[in-house]
Amino acid sequence: TIRNGLDELGYRDGDLAADLARWEADTIVPRDAVIPTLEDLLWQSRQRVAAVMYDFSSEWMEPVGVTQKPFAAYCDYPRRKVLLNLDFPYTVYALKHLATHEAFPGHLVHLGLRERYVADGSMPLDGAQVVTSSASSTLFEGIADNGMAFLDWLDTPGDQVAVALQRLRSALRCNAAWMMHEEKKTIEEIVPIIAAQGYQTTETVRGRLAFLHHDLRAPFVYAYWCGDAAVDAVWKQVPPAERKRFWHYLYGTMHTPTTLARYWR
C-alpha cells in the first residue's frame, strides 16, 4: 500500500497526504533534467526488454518535450518519438513508468510486434490497428501499464508507491469522466474533488483532465484502468517458466479483458 511504502521510505509523520506530498516533492525531477532522465530510462528499459523479452535493440524512441497538450505522454510510433508534456511535474518513478509504457515493452514493442506478425502472416491485417474505444484498446493500454512488472523493475519501495499511486489516479480519472459526461458536472466542480482524492494540486489535475474534451484521447480513459487491472490479474498467475509463452499469447493476439483471462492456460 501507499502507507506501507512511505513508512518503509521514512515518510511516516502520520498524515498520509502530507507524507505523500513530501515524498513526491523530494523525488521530482527538475524540468531541465526531465528529458535526459527519460532518455536514460528508455535506454535501460530497452536493455531489459532485449535481455528477457524481445530483441528491440535496433529500435529507439526519441523523447521530445512539448507543452499545452491534452496528454502527459504520447507514443508517436511512425516518427519513433515519445512526446512528453513538460507542463506537468514528474518524479523519477513516473518517468520510469512512462519509459516502459510508451516504448519498452509498451507501445513501441507492441506495435512493432504487430507489424512483424502481420508481415509474416501470423496475424490478420486488422491486427495492426489500434482502434479508439474498442474492446481491444483496453489491452493495448493494459500491456503498457504493466511494463515495469514484465521487466521485474519494481525493485524499490518507491516503485511500489508509484504504481499504487498511478492506479489510484487512473481510477479517479474514470470517476472524473463519469462526473463530467453522466452527472454533467463542470470541470470547476470536478477538479477539487479529484485533487483531494488523488493527492495532487488542482493545477496539475486540471491539466491532466484536459484530455476529457479531446476527441481522440477521451475514449481511452476507461481503457487505462480496466486494461491495467485485466493484464495484472492474469500476469500474477503466470509462473516464471511460462512468461515467454504468455507474452506471445498477449502480444500476438487481439484480446479483450475477457478473452485474455478465459483462454490463457
State each model region's role:
Residues 1-265:
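N-terminal maturation segment of proteins
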